[in-house]
Curated annotation (Swiss-Prot):
Gene behind the chain: MB
Binding site for heme b: H94
Residues holding nitrite: H65
Record-given protein name: Myoglobin
Catalyzed chemical reaction(s): Fe(III)-heme b-[protein] + nitric oxide + H2O = Fe(II)-heme b-[protein] + nitrite + 2 H(+); H2O2 + AH2 = A + 2 H2O
Cysteines engaged in disulfide bonds, as pairs: none
A GO MF term: oxygen binding
UniProt lineage: Eukaryota, Metazoa, Chordata, Craniata, Vertebrata
Sites of Phosphothreonine modification: T68
Length: 154
């Protein structure tokens, strides 16, 4: 399940592109999530009223939250699998406060991959996609493990 040094390098190379416009990437990830999986929108009181893509694009709060999500994920990815200290509080809040099921983490992972494919086709070939998929799978597995410890069946 672990990634090789080369795979982590591929992940972090493309992540550098994300960080150059983290709020733009985050906004696009959340819009794809909410459009592709409208049930996920119900977990966000702050965004429930946003019905159209235009409303979502115009929302500064959505843009800010997208940046927050990807900043947290970037912090985890940079730990190259040694992310227990970062995962624990995230799992705690997502299990006990936000009640975000693991399935929704799969959905957002798919959206992240799609946004990277769309925005960075030259830097996100098959090897980089495979590495990012493995990194996001590791993240989800560790979130799920923490959820289980917390008694959350999400």
């Amino acid at each position: 399940m672990g990634l090789s040094d080369g795979e982590w390098q591929l992940v972090l190379n493309v992540w550098g592109k994300v960080e150059a416009d983290i709020s733009g990437h985050g906004q696009e990830v959340l819009i794809r999530l909410f459009k592709g999986h409208p049930e996920t929108l119900e977990k966000f009181d702050k965004f429930k009223h946003l019905k159209s893509e235009d409303e979502m694009k115009a929302s500064e709060d959505l843009k800010k939250h997208g940046a927050t999500v990807l900043t947290a994920l970037g912090g985890i990815l940079k730990k190259k699998g040694h992310h227990e200290a970062e995962i624990k509080p995230l799992a705690q809040s997502h299990a006990t406060k936000h009640k975000i099921p693991v399935k929704y983490l799969e959905f957002i992972s798919e959206c992240i991959i799609q946004v990277l494919q769309s925005k960075h086709p030259g830097d996100f070939g098959a090897d980089a996609q495979g590495a990012m998929n493995k990194a996001l799978e590791l993240f989800r597995k560790d979130m799920a493990s923490n959820y289980k410890e917390l008694g959350f069946q999400g």
